Amino acid sequence: MADWQKAHGRLQRDVAGNRTVPYAGADAMTRPRQAQSPLSAADKAAALALTPVSRETEARLDAYVDLLVQWQTKTNLIASSTLPQLWTRHIADSLQLLALAPQAKRWADFGSGGGFPGVVLACALADVEGARIDLVERNAKKAAFLREAVRITGTPGVIHPMDIGDYVDRLDGRIDCVTARALAPLQVLLGFAEPLVKQGAKALLLKGQDVEAELTEATKYWNIEPRLHSSRTGGQGWIVELDRIERRDRPPTKQAWRRA
């Protein structure tokens, strides 16, 4: 049994916040009702306790989160059911990657979607000289959201509205760390990450409860020495850390995979 299989297990942690709203009186029935925020202050506090950030970074994250909630009403950026746990489930889940690559300045985030982890990392690294986060997203609406998120937060994110393969082929310069979250099967992700890892990048790939099955399948096509990190946010999340990716005889074709 491989080391990563021995290390595989589950962490469960529930983070919830409850709030009591006082009765406002009968005349409140006639007043326009303001939309209630789907976010939880307790969830934010729990996330920042897990992954502390500076006040400047927190302010940038607040601006990003507000924008995401606005856009979520018209563009499906994340599962709406996860909004009450947005800070722990998405923000903290992204921030924890920084501890695994503390010296990395140039990042490439494949399939950035709603900005996890790419925009979150950009918010955290905005004050680091020379930092740059490439956000690769071919969906036009999501790329437009990412562009606006980078603009209002003033972060060092660069939007690449193209397929991942095209980005890798055109890449100029060295990447320190490549990331992907909720994107594609591991054996496919390795094909995209391989050229960057061969040039010295570290791969940090966020996976869910099926990580063991994905690793088993991936090792049919790739020689890898993965290190598994259970998510600091609890639940069934895992981070697959890789410093080496080598092809076997029959790697899966990237063309066989199409992102929804």
Swiss-Prot record:
InterPro entries, per database record: rRNA_ssu_MeTfrase_G, SAM-dependent_MTases_sf
Annotated SUPFAM superfamilies: S-adenosyl-L-methionine-dependent methyltransferases
One GO cellular component term: cytosol
Cell compartments where the protein resides: Cytoplasm
Keywords: Cytoplasm, Methyltransferase, rRNA processing, S-adenosyl-L-methionine, Transferase
Presence of keyword rRNA processing: yes
Chief localization: cytoplasm
Record-listed E.C. numbers: 2.1.1.170
Catalyzed reactions: guanosine(527) in 16S rRNA + S-adenosyl-L-methionine = N(7)-methylguanosine(527) in 16S rRNA + S-adenosyl-L-homocysteine
Stored Gene3D superfamilies: Vaccinia Virus protein VP39 (3.40.50.150)
Residues annotated as binding S-adenosyl-L-methionine: G111, F116, R181
Superkingdom of the organism of origin: Bacteria
GO molecular function, one term: rRNA (guanine-N7-)-methyltransferase activity
Assigned protein family: Belongs to the methyltransferase superfamily. RNA methyltransferase RsmG family.
NCBIfam families xref list: rsmG_gidB
Function in brief: Specifically methylates the N7 position of guanine in position 527 of 16S rRNA.
Protein name, per record: Ribosomal RNA small subunit methyltransferase G
Name of the gene encoding the protein in the UniProt record: rsmG
